[in-house]
A protein has these predicted regions:
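Tryptophan-rich substrate-binding surfaces of secreted polymer-degrading and adhesive proteins
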Residues: 1
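Intrinsically disordered, low-complexity
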Residues: 15-62, 141-142
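Exported/periplasmic cell-wall-interacting domains
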Residues: 69-142
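Short, surface-exposed linear segments at secondary-structure transitions and domain or protein termini
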Residues: 56-66, 101-104
Length: 142
C-alpha cells in the first residue's frame, strides 16, 4: 500500500512537472518580435508581420506581456504593458489618435521606416493586430 502511494505521488509530481513544462513551452511559443530597424512587429508562430509606430526610446530586450485596464482617453480601455520605468509604462496599444497633427494613422501606413519612428517609447499597432496580441505572452524587441 505504501509503495503504491509513493508511486502515485511520484507520478503525480511527474505529470505536474510535465504539465508545467508544457505550459512554459506554450507560453514561450506565443511570442512577438519587434524589429526596430524595420518598425515592424512579427508573430513568431505565424510569421505574419505588421508595421508599427515606435520611438527612439523604445527599450530593447525580452519582456513578459501584461494586459492593463485604463480609462485614459485614446487607448480603447486597455493596453498591453511590457516594461515599467518610474511613472512610465511602456506598452503595446492601438494607434493613439488624440493629437491629429501627429498623423499617426497615416504614418503607420508609410513604407518609410523613418515615418514610423515617432512615439515616446510605446509601440502603436492597428486595431486588428492589437486584438491578436492579447493572445500572446512574450515580446522581444531587437
Amino acid at each position: 500500500m505504501l509503495k503504491a502511494l509513493c508511486l502515485l505521488m511520484l507520478l503525480g509530481a511527474s505529470v505536474a512537472a510535465s504539465a508545467s513544462g508544457s505550459i512554459d513551452t506554450f507560453m514561450q511559443s506565443k511570442k512577438v518580435i519587434v524589429y526596430t530597424d524595420k518598425a515592424e512587429l512579427c508573430f513568431a508562430d505565424t510569421k505574419e508581420c505588421h508595421p508599427v509606430l515606435i520611438g527612439k526610446t523604445t527599450p530593447k530586450g525580452r519582456f513578459d506581456l501584461q494586459l492593463y485596464s485604463t480609462e485614459k482617453a485614446g487607448y480603447g480601455g486597455d493596453v498591453i504593458g511590457f516594461k515599467q520605468e518610474k511613472d512610465f509604462l511602456f506598452a503595446l496599444h492601438r494607434v493613439w489618435t488624440l493629437k491629429p497633427s501627429e498623423r499617426r494613422l497615416e504614418r503607420i501606413r508609410s513604407p518609410l521606416v523613418a515615418d514610423r519612428i515617432m512615439t515616446n517609447g510605446c509601440i502603436n499597432v492597428h486595431d486588428e493586430v492589437y486584438e491578436k496580441l492579447k493572445m500572446y505572452f512574450v515580446l522581444e524587441i531587437l
